[in-house]
Curated annotation (Swiss-Prot):
Catalysed transformations (reactions): sn-glycerol 3-phosphate(out) + ATP + H2O = sn-glycerol 3-phosphate(in) + ADP + phosphate + H(+)
Principal subcellular localization: membrane
One Pfam family recorded for the sequence: TOBE_2
GO BP terms, alphabetized: carbohydrate transport; glycerophosphodiester transmembrane transport
Full protein name: sn-glycerol-3-phosphate import ATP-binding protein UgpC
Description of how the protein assembles with itself and partners: The complex is composed of two ATP-binding proteins (UgpC), two transmembrane proteins (UgpA and UgpE) and a solute-binding protein (UgpB).
NCBIfam families noted in UniProt: PRK11650.1 (NF008653)
GO molecular function: ABC-type glycerol-3-phosphate transporter activity; ATP binding; ATP hydrolysis activity
Length: 365
């Protein structure tokens, strides 16, 4: 195992910068997830760590070595790919053992390592099968087994679950979590799936357009998004973002102005103590933090357009002063399309963002 350091890592293609100065210190045994939409640079960053892409600027450290100029085989890493990359003519045993044979390890050590990894991954009864005789989940286990037997300093995972169906992804997430708990190998994992990121990560890096939006634990990122991008990307449904205005008067008040002519503005109350907002800002509120209430307690009303019942949860989709919002409901709530739903919310659950910079605005202590 080893620490992994990314220091001002950059990537250019034909003069176009696609990765912009990434900095991160990854501790020994830590599981880091890089999450973001397609095209944000996450796989490019992973491939630079692996040595499969040249680094335009900055440094990658594995342990106490700068590895920029080292070949992939010299970096002491093992990579698990999205498409499994198994040899179809080889058995499970031979696929897992192939890299060790190339390195010239003794047969006894190869056998011991493969059997140990097969035991961890419950592949012991499948060692003589060919990949075509395996399910998708079993093939992915073989790919992980091939990485485990190398006993690398760092594991690299490039969207390894994206080819699996939804039910199998849930199972494999649990198995990956348990695998890391047992091995405690430093791991860097790339995904576009926020659920994978939230469930697997010790810490997560949210990328957008080749830039770091936020680094933190899953709970930190969810509870205190650093930007409107993070607020809208992490969470399902995502955080509601509503434009508001600060109005002077008898104590500064916050209003949601109508999105269209004829929409009634909603007055949300006075500005919280210590919060200094620009004249125009964005208010964020997660669906589960909006509380349906009696009309005389409401700070605003949502015009309900659709109710989605999901069994354990229900969501009302509608408009607040003409702006789209989602409200999480009690699954037994008698709310229907066409209702005018009175809502309230705790000030502790409100988030504020600068619409110009898109960054979070914090209240002063």
């Amino acid at each position: 195992m080893a620490k992994l350091s990314l220091r001002n890592v950059q990537k250019h293609y034909a003069g176009l910068q696609v990765v912009h100065g990434i900095d991160m210190e990854i501790g020994d045994g830590e599981f880091i997830v890089i999450v973001g939409p397609s095209g944000c640079g996450k796989s490019t960053l992973l491939r630079m760590v692996a040595g499969l892409e040249a680094i335009t600027g900055g440094e990658v450290w594995i342990g106490d070595r700068v590895v920029n100029e080292l070949e992939p085989a010299e970096r002491d890493i093992a990579m698990v790919f999205q498409n499994y990359a198994l040899y179809p003519h080889m058995t499970v045993f031979d696929n897992m053992a192939y890299g060790l044979k190339i390195r010239g390890l003794p047969k006894s050590e190869i056998l011991a390592r493969v059997q140990q990894a097969a035991g961890i991954l419950e592949l012991g009864k499948l060692l003589e099968r060919k990949p075509r005789q395996l399910s998708g989940g079993q093939r992915q286990r073989v790919a992980m087994g091939r990485a485990i037997v190398r006993e690398p300093a760092v594991f690299l995972f490039d969207e390894p679950l994206s080819n699996l169906d939804a039910k199998l992804r849930v199972q494999m997430r649990l198995e990956l979590k348990e695998l890391h708990r047992r091995l405690r190998t430093t791991s860097l994992y790339v995904t576009h799936d926020q659920v994978e990121a939230m469930t697997l990560a010790d810490r997560m890096m949210v990328l957008s357009g080749g830039r770091v939006e936020q680094i933190g634990t899953p709970l930190e990122v969810y509870a205190r998004p650093a930007s409107t991008f993070v607020a809208g990307f992490i969470g399902s449904p995502p955080m509601n973002l509503v434009p508001v205005s600060r109005h002077a008067g008898e104590g500064a008040q916050i209003r949601v102005d109508g999105a269209q002519a004829g929409d009634a503005p909603a007055t949300l109350g006075h500005l919280p103590m210590g919060l200094h907002l620009p004249e125009h800002a964005l208010m964020g509120l997660r669906p589960e933090h909006i509380e349906p209430c009696a009309a005389d307690r409401a700070i605003a009303f949502v015009e309900v357009r659709l109710v989605e019942a999901l069994g354990a949860d229900a969501f009302a989709y509608g408009a607040l002063a003409g702006h789209p919002v989602v409200v999480r409901l009690d699954p037994h709530a008698s709310v229907k399309a066409g209702d005018r739903l009175p809502i309230t919310a705790s000030a502790d659950h409100l988030h504020w963002f600068d619409p110009q910079t898109t960054r979070r605005i914090e209240a002063l202590a």
